[in-house]
Amino acid sequence: MRAVVQRVKEASVTVAGDIKGKIDKGLLVFVGIGEGDTEEDVRYLVDKIVNLRIFEDDTHKMNLSALDLNREILAVSQFTLYGDCRKGRRPNFTGAAKPRYAEKMYDTFVKFLKNTGLKVEEGVFQAMMEVNLINDGPVTILLDSNKQF
């Protein structure tokens, strides 16, 4: 399971002109489900995301987490995080989980995020979405439950 985590001042996701999720200060999380990902991968990523110390303390040092500050999270599914571009010029997405399984794992991911007590908004699985954001920093972190990066 992979995630791109961005610290944002605000973010929203729109589908067919309707805002489906909107947050103020917090984290925008693009999440991709890989073939073979399990609930253990979900637990690992959720714990890592909500506890990442990427918010500044009073001394301007990145020392606080979303949990510490009760920040909001906008979760957006994105299978393209499994795009393999090592051969040719067109990404190969065979590493991404099949849609039915990926949706189940994505729903579990969102449920576990909500269980942390933080406000969690989300996009629409498999929809064409417009994501708007104002980066804060910018701060962007790549995570992989298989620790490939």
From Swiss-Prot:
Belongs to the DTD family. Gene3D superfamilies: D-tyrosyl-tRNA(Tyr) deacylase. Its main location: cytoplasm. NCBIfam families: D-aminoacyl-tRNA deacylase. One of its GO terms (molecular function) is D-tyrosyl-tRNA(Tyr) deacylase activity. It comes from the Bacteria. It catalyses: glycyl-tRNA(Ala) + H2O = tRNA(Ala) + glycine + H(+); a D-aminoacyl-tRNA + H2O = a tRNA + a D-alpha-amino acid + H(+). It comes from Halothermothrix orenii (strain H 168 / OCM 544 / DSM 9562). GO terms for biological process: D-amino acid catabolic process. Transmembrane segments: none annotated. An aminoacyl-tRNA editing enzyme that deacylates mischarged D-aminoacyl-tRNAs. Also deacylates mischarged glycyl-tRNA(Ala), protecting cells against glycine mischarging by AlaRS. Acts via tRNA-based rather than protein-based catalysis; rejects L-amino acids rather than detecting D-amino acids in the active site. By recycling D-aminoacyl-tRNA to D-amino acids and free tRNA molecules, this enzyme counteracts the toxicity associated with the formation of D-aminoacyl-tRNA entities in vivo and helps enforce protein L-homochirality. Keywords: Cytoplasm, Hydrolase, RNA-binding, tRNA-binding. Pfam families: Tyr_Deacylase (PF02580). This is D-aminoacyl-tRNA deacylase. A motif (Gly-cisPro motif, important for rejection of L-amino acids) lies at residues 137-138. It is found in: Cytoplasm.
